[in-house]
A protein has these predicted regions:
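Polytopic alpha-helical membrane proteins, predominantly small-molecule transporters/carriers
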Residues: 1-184
Length: 184
């Protein structure tokens, strides 16, 4: 039984909403509540690991647990990205390069172990563990890359959002799931 949702249009809508919640949630805890990035990372890493433990224990896809794990990942990923840039002072460029390296390493180990990187067929504990590690790094990279594009490249948030939306929409237009039975 697949342990993650099939990627359909509704998935992308929920993903965007959850990622937006992650971005604003991380900023709310780190800046508005003045907890700082370290405390926010600590709190939400524990929450992420708790939901992930439940998710892995279930051995099946459960929408509530999946999206709670996803959202906690988005919050901790955003806080990590901001920590790398602002607290460590590495900036968006170096932070993005580090995260790309980490993501490529995780994907390489995942492929070596599972002989596949398909998210359409996550059926084992090991595959799902790699999925969530890659997912957390990708969330962190997404925040860093978005900030890099908007700030470091100087194109601004509106153009960056339009560019990324266009790329996503062109991908969705050409996407054909392996299994037509879809759920989120």
């Amino acid at each position: 039984m697949n342990r993650v949702p099939h990627i359909i249009f509704l998935y992308w809508i929920i993903k965007i909403a959850s990622t937006t919640l992650g971005e604003t949630g991380a900023d709310m805890f780190s800046m508005t509540f003045n907890l700082g990035y370290g405390a926010t990372i600590s709190i939400f890493m524990v929450i992420f690991l708790m939901f992930l433990g439940i998710k892995l224990f279930l051995k099946r896809y459960d929408p509530l647990t999946y999206w709670l794990t996803f959202t906690a990942s988005a919050i901790v990923g955003t806080a990590i990205s901001d920590f790398i840039d602002r607290t460590l002072g590495l900036g968006y460029t170096i932070g993005s390069i580090i995260l790309i390296g980490l993501l490529l390493a995780v994907l390489a180990f995942w492929y070596i172990k599972e002989k596949s990187l398909s998210v359409e067929n996550i059926t084992t504990f090991t595959a799902e563990t790699f999925y969530w590690i890659a997912f957390l790094i990708a969330n962190t990279l997404g925040t860093a890359a978005g900030d890099f594009l908007a700030d470091s490249m100087g194109v601004g948030f509106l153009f960056s959002a339009a560019l990324i939306t266009g790329l996503l929409m062109s991908h969705l237009q050409n996407y054909q799931p392996e299994n037509k039975a879809s759920y989120t």
